[in-house]
Amino acid sequence: MTTFAPSETLHRLIKHALDSGAAGTLKEAEELFRGYRIAFVIGEDQARQPLEQATLLSAVAMASRVFLGGVFVEGSLDVPLCVGGAPGGTLADAIAELGGELSGSALGRSTIIIGGPPMPRREGFCVRTICAGWRGGIAPGHSAVVPTAGPEMPLTAMLSAALAVNEAFLYVSGGTPAAGYRVVGLSLWEPAATTDWLTETGGEPQLTYLPSQLWLLGLGHLGQAYLWGLGLLPYADPASLSLVLQDVDVVTPSTLSTSILSDRTMLGKKKTRAMAAWAEQRGFTTTICERLFDASVRRQIGEPAMGICGLDNALGRLALDKAGFEFVVEAGLGRGHRDFRTMRIHTLPNGRETSNLWNADSATEAVQEGPAYEAMLKNGELDKCGVTLLAGKAVGAPFVGAVAASLTLSEILRLLHGAPVNQLIDLDLQCVEHRSIVKNSCDFSSLNPGFVLV
């Protein structure tokens, strides 16, 4: 039986309550989260649609790691499952596997409605997910907002689900008084803040090309969100996607709180092997690499030319331009209780060396002298070393990684469909409308990193 250190067992979003002062002790923080509940409602027509099924299952998989008091689903759920990679034979089976409970009524609970038309106003928190073309977002459940149609793009399911769960957590945790009362969304085809994400401008393409080879660096919070997103894409033959999966860590109880594909059966197992098993069950082809990614790693002929980076350390990122990749998309997330909803996405090459993009030493919030950590030390729960290790762990939430993964994978899809890629996407889920985008000036028109047709 594997024994885990306290720093490996702490729920990464419960840590937000400790670091922010919302809870004075770990017990108080855990009780607070056990009081968080969320309900999902899906209509009979929506329950049979692949995009709405993907939205619901993505949302349940995230919410079950956040709303520890229960995730409840109302709707006609005994329908055939039509989402690749999801567990079970029916929608109800998949919901149960992902941590949801089948419920006759969502009344009295904070509610997320999956797609469909505007609904009558409800008491309390209620938002509706929106997917149209390459655009995804949320609106108040009763809002008359209806987007113009466009060619379906499955990653909008993950995007809208993540935005909805983020909004619900903002509401229950008191993160912003506007939670649930605003329209929030973006376009994965043109993510600039100036884009009207509710309107299709004619530029969105039919999804035609998918990557055939990818190298995933890091298989934690971000890496598993990448895999979930890849699992939603419509591969005619899933075996046509070849993945190199690189990581050195094992799945810990902390992993379960942020990483969308991890479950208790994986505890103590290498992330590479657990994720390879999931990917192969989805039908993908995998190769695993269980060594640190650093400046000594070199891509060999025949290995994926495109890298997707989800590493949480600057030293690994500094080596991204030395490994021989022809194209890299990298995402980094905030670590502290104030900035954990922030993300910054880079594409490489972009005319700058990685040494000019990141510092080897990254600043962290000093929280180990907070009341919750002082209580642990005073009560003898942990010694000074244990408190320091625990306080140094990042705050994290699965909905943050899911939004970042939607944007990261979309950069690859945009490249394959001939669009200019973005050098930088800077976004905070507290205020999505204030995101900033910088276009990549490099010419990728002659790059062929490998693709297959939908």
Per-segment meaning from a language model:
Residues 78, 250-252:
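Helix N-cap at the beta1-alpha1 junction of Rossmann-like dinucleotide-binding domains, i.e.
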Residues 141, 254-260:
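Short acidic, glycine/proline-rich loop/turn micro-motifs
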Residues 243-244:
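Conserved beta-strand positions in the Rossmann-like core of class I SAM-dependent methyltransferases
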